[in-house]
Amino acid sequence: MKLKIALLAGDGIGPEVIEQAVKVSDAVAKKFNHEISWHPALTGAAAIDAVGDPYPQETHDICASSDAVLFGAIGHPRFDNDPSAKVRPEQGLLKMRKELGLFANVRPTFTFPSLIDKSPLKKERIEGTDLVFLRELTGGIYFGKKGREDDGNTAFDHCVYSRAEVQRLAKKGFEMAMSRGKKLCCVDKANVLETSRLWRETVQAMEKEYPEVEVSYEFVDAVAMRLVQWPKGYDVIITENLFGDILTDEASVISGSMGLMPSASVGSKVRLYEPIHGSYPQAAGKDIANPLATVLSAAMMFEDFDLNEEALAIRDVVNKSLAEGFVTEDLAEGGKAYKTSEVGDWLAKNI
């Protein structure tokens, strides 16, 4: 198979972890006789510094004409510490999602046998956890009207959803549940929010189309609690943008390290794959960042091209590196810590 992949390294540790994912992907392509052409493009703070736009038109054109996008990280503290900044790196990610039609974020949460004791939660609570979040990405409060009134002393952010937006996200959720454990949980706050009531009634109306799927409805605060108490009780979770943003980060600690969790953002056309961790600017250029989440994001990419054996090869070599302790300092726990580039080389060599 020939694949054209847009490569958006982004900011902070993004370039370093992306480099390792490329190494591993190229090793997979060589082993399984595929051809990958990589097409680098700027985004985030790097793009602001270069052209003044966190998601330039040139970057969009490269992404839109590619089979998939592999993305590193976005963000820089100089923007975080400047509330007056009109242009911010994160605006590039929001713009990219909107313009590429990436309306659903797929965020798996699972455990690694060799790292189960690194989780802050008890082994018996989390062992065997295998759930996936489907978070709506292009609607809700992040994209609603916002502003200030009363000389800046009053602020507002509007949350708006259409039935069509909920339906397309829920459809993917039901389809995913059908291919997994046939359980779907819709997370909302329907006791107080009108948008949540729209979510609930829309999903309820779709239930009859998927009679094999067991559907439940839970308030977001209850789910935040149950994710800590018994995450194994969930299979597929669908939710709106803000709730999903918070819950997926909460769930990321189940595995023991945010540096291990991959994700995908999907729509009707191109798909984007990225680690869930941030840009970690204090580690940038030090060759110490954990690349495994980015490598596993590449595995998700292969899987979505129906290259399941290739995806499994990546997951197997990642599990092997964890079991044998060939890891970066965040996972070393007093043992030998390897550099980001060394981990990437080892993974590629052992594919």
Describe the residue ranges of each PLM region.
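N-terminal beta-loop-helix "entrance" segment that forms/cooperates
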Residues: 33-57, 225-227
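Extreme N-terminal starter segment of soluble prokaryotic enzymes
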Residues: 1-5
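Glycine-rich phosphate/diphosphate-binding loop of Rossmann-like nucleotide-binding domains
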Residues: 6-23, 28-29, 151-221, 233
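Glycine-rich phosphate/pyrophosphate-binding loop and the adjoining helix
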Residues: 138-180, 184, 190-192, 210, ...
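Glycine-rich phosphate/nucleotide-binding loop
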Residues: 45-48, 228-326
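N-terminal glycine-rich phosphate/adenylate-binding segment common to multiple enzyme folds
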Residues: 49-156, 242-244
